[in-house]
């Protein structure tokens, strides 16, 4: 064997095994959810949960970083979203929390840090509330830009609305649901800074359209009228709340969530840090650093 061939063969034998995997989890009501795992099999576990209408693919900048840094990374598409099955039932937060529980159990995820964006945080809060017997599976929570109450009570004072950064009025929720097809592009664009490229915006918009407008409307109505304020004080694991100065969700009310969680911490991405609702996409280097610093502290 020639020396070059011998060296090539030796290097090939030393190449780390590809541990990336894509599979399906079947929920208790028979829906198949698409998931991916990457990174070392024995690495610290981290699970990324997308927001309303979003997909696992939108976490790709986090998957690339954390899997390369030695973490075992799991992402999944919620029912009706992304590459998962798209039934005509189950579009409510309680069902999505049950789906999350099925995923955790079937993949046997333990000592896992959950990073949840937007509605993914609501799903995590619902899961914490509904499945107390499974709480020891989770080591850390990172809640990204989600209000504890999305829709303001019409009888609230302005101060009460600001305290929780309620984004909608009741009529506003139903208007969004009714006009879903036309409302989606401007609504998605409002979640980014002006610096997002048109190619990136169109790609994210295409991800949003992987769930039907009908099912997205049903889901947002259920999501928008949930109130998680009584759940927050019962979270007893390390939790970080991330807000954005440029987000559609006013940062003070998002950071307020951390004050309701015992020992909760908060970090607000500034304008200079591209602190939009999608700061993890627009400033992945800073976002990944903040998350990793928290879960390893």
Name every feature range the model reports, one short phrase each.
Residues 1-46, 68-71, 109-110, 136, ...:
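Alpha/beta-hydrolase fold catalytic core
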Residues 53, 78-82, 121, 148, ...:
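Alpha/beta-hydrolase active-site loop signature
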Residues 31, 36-86:
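Conserved HGGG/HGGXW glycine-rich cap/lid loop of the alpha/beta-hydrolase fold
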Residues 236-275, 281:
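Conserved loop-alpha-helix segment in the C-terminal half of the alpha/beta-hydrolase fold
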Residues 28-31, 68, 75-119, 132-135, ...:
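Active-site loop/oxyanion-hole signature of alpha/beta-hydrolase fold enzymes
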Residues 152-162, 173-233:
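Conserved alpha/beta-hydrolase catalytic His-Asp/Glu region
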Residues 125, 133-175:
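Flexible "cap/lid" loop of the alpha/beta hydrolase fold
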Residues 120, 124-128:
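Short helix immediately C-terminal to the catalytic nucleophile in hydrolase catalytic domains
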């Amino acid at each position: 064997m020639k020396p070059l061939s011998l060296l090539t063969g030796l290097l090939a034998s030393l190449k780390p095994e590809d541990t990336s995997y894509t599979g399906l989890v079947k929920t208790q009501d028979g829906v198949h959810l698409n998931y991916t795992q990457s990174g070392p099999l024995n690495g610290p576990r981290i699970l990324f949960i997308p927001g309303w209408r979003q997909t696992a693919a939108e976490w790709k900048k986090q998957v690339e970083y954390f899997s390369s840094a030695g973490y075992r990374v799991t992402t999944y598409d919620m029912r009706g979203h992304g590459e998962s099955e798209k039934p005509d039932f189950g579009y409510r937060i309680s069902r999505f929390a049950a789906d999350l529980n099925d995923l955790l159990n079937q993949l046997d995820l333990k000592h896992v840090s959950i990073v949840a964006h937007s509605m993914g945080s609501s799903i995590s809060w619902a899961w914490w509330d509904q499945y107390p017997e499974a709480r020891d599976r989770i080591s850390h929570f990172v809640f990204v830009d989600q209000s504890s109450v999305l829709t303001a009570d019409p009888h609230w004072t302005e101060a009460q609305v600001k305290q929780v950064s309620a984004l909608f009025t009741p009529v506003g929720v139903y208007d969004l649901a009714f006009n879903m097809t036309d409302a989606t592009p401007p609504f998605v664009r409002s979640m980014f800074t002006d610096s997002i490229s048109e190619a990136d915006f169109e790609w994210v918009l295409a991800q949003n359209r992987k769930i039907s407008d009908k099912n997205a409307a049903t889901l947002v109505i259920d999501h928008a009228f949930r109130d998680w304020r009584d759940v927050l004080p019962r979270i007893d694991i390390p939790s970080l709340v991330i807000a954005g100065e440029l987000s559609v969700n006013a940062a003070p009310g998002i950071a307020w969530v951390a004050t309701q969680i015992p020992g909760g911490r908060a970090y607000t991405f500034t304008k200079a840090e591209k602190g939009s609702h999608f700061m993890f996409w627009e400033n992945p280097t800073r976002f990944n650093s903040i998350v990793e610093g928290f879960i390893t502290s």
